[in-house]
Curated annotation (Swiss-Prot):
This is Receptor-type guanylate cyclase gcy-18. Residues 543-848 form the Protein kinase domain. Residues 853-884 form a coiled coil. One of its GO terms (molecular function) is metal ion binding. Residues 918-1048 form the Guanylate cyclase domain.
Amino acid sequence: MLKTLLFILIFFNIPIIAIEEIPDIKENGEKSSYTQFDNGAKLEVNKEHKRVIKIGHIGAVGVMPNDARILNISKENLIEEGLVGDDIEFEIVSRQACSESFEGVAVAAELYHVHQVRAFIGPYCAAELEAVTKMATFWNIPIISYSSVPNAVSDRSVYKTLARVSSKNTNSIAEATVALLLHYKWLKVAIATNTGSTAFERVSIFEEIMHREGVTIVKKVMFDENTDANEMMNSGQLGDLAANARIIICLFSSTKELSKEFMQATYTMRMNNAEYAYIIPWLQSGTKDLTPWIGADGEMLQRVKDHYANAIIVDDVNGFDDSVVSSFVEKIEKHGMQKSDIDVTNINGYLHLFDSLKLYALAIRKVLNETDNEAYVTNGQFIWNRMRRMKFEGVVSRSSSEENKDAGAIGTVLMDDVADRAPIFSAFYISPNRDKVMKMVNMESELISNCDGLKNKSGCFQLKINDIKSGFWPSEDGSMPLDEPICGYRGQRCSYLLEISVGSLIILLILISVVFFFLFRYCENKQLEKMPWRIFHDDLQFIDEEQVKSMMSVGSVTTKLSNIQTGQKQHAIIGVNTHTTYHRYKQRRPIKFIKEDMQLLTQMKQAVHDNLNPFLGAAFNEKEEMLVLWKFCSRGTIQDIIYNANVVLDEKFHGAFVRDITLGLEYLHASPIGYHGSLTPWCCLIDRNWMVKLSDYGIANPLERWEKQGAIEIAAAKDSDDKSQASQATSIIYMAPELLKNRETNKRRGMDQSWVKQSMLRRQAGDIYSFGMVMYEILFRSLPFRDNTNISELVDYLADGSKTVSPEIQNQMGLHPDLNALLRDCWSENPEIRPSIRRVRLNTEMVLKTKGSLVDQMMKMMEQYANNLEKLVAERTGMLEEANIRADQLLTQLLPAYVANELKMGRSVAPKLYSSATILFSDIVGFTTICSGSTPLEVVNMLNGLYTGFDECITRNKSYKVETIGDAYMVVSGIPEENEYNHSRNIANTALDMRQYLTGYQIPHRPTHRVRCRWGFHTGSVAAGVVGLTCPRYCLFGDTVNVSSRMESTGTPGMIQMSEEAHMHIRAHHPVFTTTERGEVQVKGKGTCRTFWLEDRVGDASTTNYIQNVEGV
């Protein structure tokens, strides 16, 4: 009904309009003609004599909440700025539309005819703007659009009173995109779009502007509106793009979703290198969408962002800057609103709405200043003309960010020559390596003088582009890509003959080099295969420690020495029965053997001496590891012997060990090998005949060179369990000072440490130094340093080679003077004055005289050990028997003797049902009261004394105590050993003896108090058995247990209560006891039961006296 009325008003209540053509002078002095409509309207005057101008605002249902409040805040700001309030006043009438078809038209008619508004702000919906604008033109009132508007309303010859404050529309962003193309001289482009009216309209606008500016569209591909990345790739159109263009403009109806699919497709098709540039005009339907690589939870989707590599987004200057949100929120908070009151995603809508009212106020103020004529205030075209080329500061001031400091931010509003907001755009480069997009250029509008937008149908502005970043493109020199590659899209413009020729020549030279290399390596490998020390992994059979132990058996007679645990952990068998130990080194690349290496290894293989451990060979260049193999010695190393506290070493051992080491060194120094190079205690092995054999000789220097070349890793061997390595961390202690210094000096100079410059004599002098350290360890079973020396710290101290520590003899009292002098000579810092190995051998043989072999000495020691072992076995056997007796006694106290014997024999004790047995329960009366007035220790002492007496009563009457829990005491007879009918008699005697025992028992800490108890027993069938594995318990089960407990609990202090069954059993088999019937008693779980008191034994005066005493109490 309302809509009908409004349309009647439109067609039948139209005021008389005078039409007049008048010239107007713009700010730049140029004349501009327009048609002026006089609607004859008069303004209302309020009580304060202010002219009231009504403004109609047409919003949208469900969009931009609290938009009316924003307009009121804008109005308050205008009053503060003095634009409104002195002589005029704005009255804003807000209505909502967009919910039904053309509802905004009806709302506009209502606002004009009913409320007599003199200006429109809105409508928000683009579908209703065209119709409402035509009506406003007809009525000659200004209309200001603050949302994204369609291109159809751009013609000012039709829409004569329309001003647009929105900062981004299809026309403006098309102008910015084309300006960017011209800036980078991209005159050949392709367009990727989709079907649908929205995309068609956008493409049409872009094509028109490109044609005007001379940009050629070389290819246009169109996808379905609901397509995805897979369909785009399968369509084959991406290949057409790659064959015809390098600059691609993405114009989709849904910019966010379809561009995401398109960029994923180009990424998959490998169209994401530096030759391609993808320009995405960021056209949005209304609200400010999140970028595609930001998820709903605000987290970045790195994989999606990677797809946008080499993409350029054209958007307004604050498109990726959220600082405007905080500035706007801060302004509205001053007027009582909160951030939650607005839709932040549509922040631009609020900013444009705010600025729309200010634009109208500035135009009104300008009209009043010029004419002070009310007729001009209500003249829509006159006011619209004053909006042209107007510039003012909007709701948000100029951005203060680093990238926006030279650009007009969204707060600066510049209207062009047709009263449209002049665009301010930026181009943003998306870098996968940065969290935020990078602003590359700013595009700010500059008005063109001497230009009439009504005549040439343009805004009379040009975009000025300022470069912010350069050299950022992922090309070799950082320059932007060309619109057409130098060699063409398919490489057809370039000849590659020279490149192909040079490349072929290079490939040929590489192939020749590779052939020569492999030929050389083949010959080298053949030569290595012929070496006597070469061993292949396939010839090795690796064995574990259990297999080694079985192979090391030496017979039935064993001693402490023969059972020494050796440090050699890695064992293998070569061929059939050659037992070896090996050192494993991680190999990172093939080892290159020089001539000196092969000669040395051959000499080591050929070396034969009684005191040298045979070098069996090396396995290398296989399975990423190198193995150095030596013959296995079953007795371990000297280090194992020295630091084993169970081994007693006398002078014979000292002499034999030192003699063998000197003989081995003497042979090495006289052989082609020349020296040992790494003498340590773990390199001195002992075979099954107790002869010392030197190992790891000569190999240390090649290993160190191979490590420096990066072929092997010796550090891995240092950290292993194998203590017989040639390069342990502590081996540095045994090295001569000059060798350490030389090694570090060479390392600092970057020289190859081949030791070639070291003379043979100096290397032999280094062996003498190491021998002195080893001999000291043999004699004193310690290193020649103070007892509090930390070996790890000492190793670190010596590691850099710039510091040395001189060894010292710590115990000179038991050392022969000749050996004292010899050790000092061996440790001399001057290698020239150290003795030769021959002199060392002669001196040691004179002092450490050894007759015979160590085997004879070992046989004597074994005999002594066997004698001592017999005595030790006898002593230990006696101790074991005593322990077994004590254990048996303790076990029989915890469990019945029969059960304990069964468990000791390893047999399980099966549960058993006893047809007749008697169970007794006793309880201390007032136990809680006694405990409350006693300490825990006093309670324990009291119970211990009481239960000790009870235990004697049980033992005397052949009963068995089952358990005690606190003050409760449980006794049984007839279990586990059955005793026919005697169990009731035993229990009766036990109860009477316990009662008799209490007559003389005094509480230790309360001598004046007497302990009183209740007793109760019952006769019946009982099940018994051992329960539990840990702390097994002998437990009783059955109704007899429960009835016995009830006999105790329902009894009287000092009295012994029995069940009717127990009474019948005693009367039938043991009439010596006197009993008295108590009567019927209510028993829990049994109902009414007939019970009896056990009073005495016939002829027992003591128990009678006890009963009299109890009755007296």
